[in-house]
């Protein structure tokens, strides 16, 4: 309940971090729990942990689409992941995987990096500092993983026809 209420206050929350997605995990045999970290009664990080048993004794833990946290705040990120690591060790978790939904670099509709665009390479550096390893950024599909590249469209102030007509001809053809 507390987790759901917190999600309602965060702009960056995605479906994969929702209690609805937790129910899907549970239906598929995962054990799910929600944790949060706070400082002076202010929540600064939270996440949904999903566990699967490994070899009857150990566990694999997956944090779908990452923590709800400010990845640019290096100190709090390191503090949270350090506490999380200790917590998971007590639960016999031997592998933690996460795939945070972070806009790494701005790309155009063809997937090319936009010149003089925003980037979040510092976020990747902060996660590495917190002890995470980055898997290679590969294009293509891997059905065992969430997609690595996501596109988003700003829908504000546009009609459905304007949005649809801005798609490439192949995308328009495939969505009719």
Task: Give the predicted meaning of each segment.
Residues 1, 45, 123-176:
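Acyltransferase donor/substrate-recognition loop-hinge adjacent to the catalytic core
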Residues 7-11, 84-88, 127:
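Hydrophobic, Leu/Ile/Phe/Ala-enriched alpha-helical segments that form helix-helix packing faces
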Residues 19-21, 80-84, 134-138:
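Short alpha-helical segments and helix-capping/turn motifs at coil-helix boundaries
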Residues 1-21, 176:
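Short amphipathic alpha-helix that is part of the acyltransferase structural core
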Residues 12, 30, 93, 129-133:
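Short aromatic/hydrophobic-glycine micro-motifs
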Residues 114, 118-126:
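Extracellular disulfide-rich cysteine clusters
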Residues 23-115:
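Conserved donor-binding loop and adjoining core beta-sheet/short helix segment
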């Amino acid at each position: 309940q507390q987790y759901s209420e917190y999600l309602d206050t965060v702009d960056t929350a995605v479906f994969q971090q929702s209690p609805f997605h937790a129910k899907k995990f549970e239906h598929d045999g995962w054990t799910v729990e929600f944790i949060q970290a706070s400082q002076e009664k202010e929540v600064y990080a939270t996440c949904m942990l999903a566990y699967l048993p490994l070899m009857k004794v150990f566990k694999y833990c997956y944090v779908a689409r990452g923590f709800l946290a400010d990845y640019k705040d290096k100190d709090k990120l390191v503090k949270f992941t350090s506490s999380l690591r200790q917590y998971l060790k007590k639960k016999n978790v031997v592998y933690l995987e996460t795939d945070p939904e972070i806009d790494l670099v701005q790309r155009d509709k063809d997937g090319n990096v936009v010149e003089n665009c925003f980037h979040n390479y510092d976020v990747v550096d902060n996660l590495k500092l917190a002890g995470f390893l980055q898997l290679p950024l590969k294009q293509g599909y891997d059905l065992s993983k969430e997609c690595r590249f996501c596109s988003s469209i700003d829908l504000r102030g546009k009609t459905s026809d304007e949005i649809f007509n801005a798609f490439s001809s192949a995308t328009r053809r495939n969505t009719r």
